[in-house]
Amino acid sequence: MRRFIQWCTVIGLLLGLVPLAQAQGSYPDRPIRFVVAFPPGGATDTFFRLISNELGTALGQSIVIENKGGAGGYIAWQMVAAAPADGYTVLVAENAIGINQALFKKHPSGFNPLKDYDAVGAMGSVPVVWTVANNVPANSFPEFVQWSKTVPGHFNYGHAGPGSVSHLVPEVILDGAGMQAVPVPFKGGGPAAQAVAGGFVAVVVSSLAVAKPQMEGKLVKGLLVTSAKRSPAIPEVPTLKELGIKVADVDLEFWWGLFVPKGSPEPIRAKIEKALQATMSNPVVRDRLAKVDTDPSYAPGPALTAKLEREITNWSKFIDAKGIKVEQ
């Protein structure tokens, strides 16, 4: 009798695994929601829309992009972390997810990207551009530094929210150039970029993909790019090295990766990763990204996790050294 009960238990467990295996085998059988933690028009939204069609083709399913801005990214990050771990809700993250962790240390919500997510893969990076409003009387970065001395501590820069790339990268450049400024938060990189174009703030650091069309339209002036050498997309803009600005050892760029809720089935995570790898090696995608000097570099999940860990460590050193704090 005892053996009979044991066999029934085993059979019950095996039968319970059948629907799960079938679900994993048929994945994806409905549209997949990819969540961007910032409003349309920002760096992450712009980048992902450049690759989303090909990623959907590689997955064999439609992609639905959902922009869920607010709280510097935390609303979306927590929402996706709490979603069912079934592969149908994926986070499109930028390095702000690591910078925030370095800035806030322990968020009141308890959110921690290393504990709450499984990394799918890295999918590219792009340098950022120091863009200034047309009403700022400077046409080069040295001229901008000289102008800043006439308004010490009083010029402002817009950013996408506390802990965002456009919040902390300017602080690194300001530190290296010996300037001070007042940060002005917006609800995303798109609104911040619109603000500098309208002359409402003096500076915004934008991804090259966002800055280039603004520069071509004479809406802003690009005075500095954070790439190691001049970008072919904006060859007239000098680099930090050319300008003699020494900065902290942090990534002065946007980089992106896909994450799924912790505990997502490995076969499903692997399918998304395989589709991402195929997308980033697609010649059409690579050519499209090259036009905005975006490196379509793919890296697997473990490499993305390691990159996120380094990001948190390096930014923590800079933030702690400079005593940067933001009210939570």
Predicted region positions:
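Positively charged n-region of N-terminal signal peptides that target proteins for export
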Residues: 1-4
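Bacterial N-terminal signal peptides
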Residues: 7-19
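N-terminal (or domain-start) structured segment
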Residues: 23-116, 153-154, 162, 166, ...
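An extracytoplasmic/periplasmic, membrane-proximal ligand-sensing/linker region
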Residues: 29-31, 175-179, 242, 266-328
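Hinge/capping helix and adjacent helix->loop/strand transition within the periplasmic-binding protein
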Residues: 79-88, 101-191, 240-242, 255-288
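Short secondary-structure boundary segments
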Residues: 94-95, 134, 207-209, 227-228, ...
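C-terminal lobe and pocket-closing loops
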Residues: 125, 211-281, 313, 327
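Residue-level signature of catalytic and energy-coupling elements of molecular machines
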Residues: 144, 196, 315
